[in-house]
Amino acid sequence: LARSSITSWTLRVGTAAALGIDAAVHTHLAPAYDPVKATVSQGQLFRVEAGLAIVAGLLVLIRPRPSSWIAALLVSAGGLAAVLLYRYVDVGPLGPLPDMYENTWQVPGKLLSAYAEGAAVVLAGLGLLVHGGGTRARAKRRLS
């Protein structure tokens, strides 16, 4: 395999694995958080996060285009931002969202999910650089 092919596969598999861990943790925790609700329960939000992580991971594996890397980056960065925000800031309920403040890392899987989301942010960002670069150059070659 060519060096760029190995790099591509490493980034794709790594990003998908990190998003898979994120999805597994959120799926596992969702039932325990169903009682925490305003209009939407925290468990429902966890299931949405899990679904988005699965889709983004599959996109990166199956179709490693810039749009797939952007999706993976947005899902992982959004998840990481949410867990950090609600860990350190008591935001309270926001519209249909429940009060998700949880001043601890002791919840089983919470820290693992945060690490996985952080890894996915880095890997998806690198994937976007690797797979997103050169698009204009390829387009120019096709036009000439």
Regions found by a protein language model. Name each.
Residues 1-144:
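Membrane-interface extramembranous regions
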